[in-house]
Swiss-Prot record:
GO BP terms, alphabetized: cobalamin biosynthetic process
Gene behind this protein: cobS
Protein name: Adenosylcobinamide-GDP ribazoletransferase
Protein task: Joins adenosylcobinamide-GDP and alpha-ribazole to generate adenosylcobalamin (Ado-cobalamin). Also synthesizes adenosylcobalamin 5'-phosphate from adenosylcobinamide-GDP and alpha-ribazole 5'-phosphate.
InterPro entries reported for this sequence: CobS
GO CC annotations on file: plasma membrane
């Protein structure tokens, strides 16, 4: 078993396992060691993993002949369940913070355990837009690929936000991401995962090369712009705004691809 342990740690299995436990509700063998120190480098891999699960469900429901809108609602429901609402909680808290006109009080409002009216509305908007965007695709192969692009590049936006902007709280779940990130190697790894994963799945699903190239560039631009916009509103980022970057990037990427 010694060879297995060497291989496991050499290829970052302990870090991947920790990323699965932190970012998803998927199981991981409790006897396998995990290390949470640098899990942010695997966040785009988590996006690809989740998108493949959703893609399988989407394809299965399509094969069964389920109505498009109902099918999309089921897929989005599993999407929410697989993440445990981790990022959606950030959408709510960030919306409540943005509703405060005094910027100096926004962080305090976001720490309140109660969700305000703006937070509830933001959650509803995100879920509705995802559902209707998925239902609007006339090409089912493109809809499947859109899931991969949205989940992967949305999380790349979070990785970029961690790398580029200051973290506004000394403690919290997001602090360890900023503290432990090794900028160049981790950002490069996360970018390579989603670029090769997105392009590879695009070819596998028979997506036109011009669309693969254009959507890859556009998705990266959207994810960067969303992270930058939230950083401008708060003068940096928190764990909540990281979640908001993921969710709103996913929404905008889905909406953009639905127009093709």
């Amino acid at each position: 078993m010694e060879w297995w342990r060497r291989w496991y740690f050499l290829w970052g299995g302990d870090s991947v396992g920790a990323a699965i436990l932190f970012y998803t509700r998927l199981p991981w063998p409790p006897s396998w060691p995990v290390n949470f120190d640098r899990i942010a480098r695997w966040i785009t891999l988590m996006g690809l993993l989740l998108s493949l699960i959703l893609l399988a469900l989407d394809r299965g429901l399509h094969w069964l002949g389920m109505d498009n809108l109902l099918q999309s609602a089921v897929v989005v429901s599993l999407w929410l369940a697989l993440t445990g609402g981790l990022h959606l909680d950030g959408v709510a808290d960030t919306a409540d913070g943005l509703a405060v006109t005094n910027p100096s009080k926004r962080l305090a409002v976001m720490q309140d355990s109660y969700t305000g009216a703006y937070g509830v509305m933001a959650i509803a908007v995100v879920l509705l837009l995802k559902t209707f965007a998925l239902a609007s695709f006339s090409d089912h192969g493109l809809a499947s690929w859109a899931l991969i692009m949205a989940l992967g590049w949305g999380r790349w936006g979070q990785l970029l936000a961690i790398a580029l902007y200051p973290y506004l709280r000394e403690n919290g779940k997001g602090a360890m991401h900023k503290r432990n990130l090794k900028l160049r190697p981790d950002l490069l790894l996360g970018t390579m995962i989603i670029v090769f994963g997105g392009v590879g799945m695009g070819y596998a699903l028979a997506i036109e090369p011009w669309l693969i190239l254009g959507a890859t560039g556009s998705s990266a631009l959207i994810a960067w712009a969303v992270g930058r916009w939230f950083a401008q509103q708060f003068k940096g980022h928190t764990g909540d705004t990281y979640g908001a970057v993921v969710e709103w990037s996913e929404v905008l990427i889905l909406l953009g691809l639905s127009l093709v």
